[in-house]
Structure formats: C-alpha cells, structure tokens
C-alpha cells in the first residue's frame, strides 16, 4: 500500500474543500453574519491547513492502484464530511455533531434527507453551504475533485473506479480527468441556465442560487 500518495491525495482534497468553504463565507459577509463568517473562515483555515500538511508528504511514486484508490476514496469521504459538518455545529444551527454529519453526508450524496424541520430561520451562509453541498454531490464528489486533482498515469481511472458503482468506467474522451471536466462543465452550464430562468421568473438572486444548487438535474432538498 502506497500510504504516502493516499495521504497526499487527501491533502489536496482538504485544501480544495477549504477553498470551497470560502464561498459560504462570502455569503455571510454580504449579509453581515459576522459570527457565521468567522466559523466558515476558521473551518476553511483548518481544512486547508491540515490539507497542506498532508500535501507535503512526498510519495516515492505518484501512481496508485485500485487498493490505494479504495483507501483514498474512503478517507476522502470521511474527512470532507466531517469538515463539512463543522460549520453546522459551531454556529449552533445543528448542535448535535451526529446530526450535523448526517446533514452533510445527505448533501454530498444528494440523498435529500434532512434532520431540520424547517430551514427558513437558518443564517444565509449556512443555507448557502447546505445547498452547495448538494450541488457538489450532484455529479459525485470525487468526480468533481477528479477534474481538479493533479494525478498522473492511471491514477484518475483507479480513483474513479473506486467511486463508481459499476464494474467499469465509461469515458467521453481518453483521459478520465478530461471527462470529469467536460461533465462538470455541462453541469455548471445547466445550473447557470436554471439560475437565469429563475431570475426571469422574478425569484430573488440568493433564493434562485439555492434552488439551482439543489434542483439542477435532480431534486434534493427544499429551498427557503
């Protein structure tokens, strides 16, 4: 087992999640939710910091095989879910860590289940993050990350095989990373198209964004 490449990959993933956490932080800044803003900035810093520390691990080989793919997939799912649940807990929106983890995993897996009886009273930054997890998971979390991760050789294929439910991986183009980029490019375009239609229908911008995040391609959760 090439543990070094697994942890290095996990480091990349956590740094990416740290960057993604800045988006709900920006929403909190716009709406003047200073406590929520601080929580997102702290969570982003911790995620990026841990990720950078793991990223410094130098593997002997940058190519990994199926067993490394399964290990990396499992660890990535655990860590991104735990870090994604932190803002719910620290802001007090979902005080119970288990409930917060359930809400986060439900978002990343687009399950659509929720422990929240109503979402209208949540801070806008939390609403943004909750809906954004659905959008990230809409095409598969690791498919999204595959489009960003700097892997080599057959590493992308082995990682996607570990994430995919079927016995084989279908590709639009020879490179798996290019396939992931094409798929998320189409996904992003469809999201923007839905957003435009919602705005034409006179839905407020913020609510339109949350609705587009949660309903592009599939229905996952109610928007406020």
Predicted regions and their residues:
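Cytosolic juxtamembrane amphipathic/interface segments immediately preceding
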Residues: 1-4, 60-64, 164-178
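N-terminal alpha-helical transmembrane segments of multi-pass membrane transport
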Residues: 1-99
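Membrane-water interface regions at transmembrane-helix termini and the short interhelical loops
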Residues: 28, 53-66, 121-131, 148, ...
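Pore-domain transmembrane helices of cation channels
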Residues: 43, 47, 167-194
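Transmembrane-helix bundle segments that line or gate the permeation/cavity pathway
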Residues: 81-117, 124, 134-159, 186-188, ...
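Alpha-helical membrane-spanning segments of integral membrane proteins, especially the hydrophobic core
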Residues: 119-139, 170, 174-182
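Juxtamembrane inter-helical linkers in multi-pass membrane proteins
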Residues: 154-175, 212-217
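Conserved small/polar residues in nucleotide/adenosyl-binding loops
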Residues: 219-224
């Amino acid at each position: 087992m090439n543990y070094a490449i697994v942890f290095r990959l996990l480091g990349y993933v956590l740094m990416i999640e740290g960057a993604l956490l800045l988006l709900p932080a920006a929403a909190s800044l716009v709406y003047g939710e200073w406590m929520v803003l601080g929580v997102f900035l702290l969570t982003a810093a911790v995620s990026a910091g841990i990720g950078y520390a793991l990223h410094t691990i130098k593997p002997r080989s940058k190519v990994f095989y199926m067993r490394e793919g399964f290990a990396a997939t499992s660890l990535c799912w655990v860590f991104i879910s735990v870090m994604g649940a932190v803002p719910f807990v620290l802001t007090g929106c979902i005080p119970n860590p288990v409930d917060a983890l359930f809400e986060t995993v439900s978002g990343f897996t687009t399950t659509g289940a929720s422990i929240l009886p109503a979402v209208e009273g949540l801070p806008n930054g939390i609403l943004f993050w909750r809906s954004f997890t659905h959008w990230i998971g809409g095409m598969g979390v690791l498919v999204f990350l595959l489009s960003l991760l700097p892997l080599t050789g057959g590493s992308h294929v082995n990682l996607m095989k570990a994430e995919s439910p079927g016995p084989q991986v279908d590709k639009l183009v020879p490179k798996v990373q290019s396939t992931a980029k094409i798929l998320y490019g189409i996904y992003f375009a469809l999201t923007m198209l839905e957003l435009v239609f919602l705005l034409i229908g006179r839905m407020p911008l913020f609510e339109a964004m949350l609705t587009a995040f949660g309903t592009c391609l599939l229905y996952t959760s109610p928007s406020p």
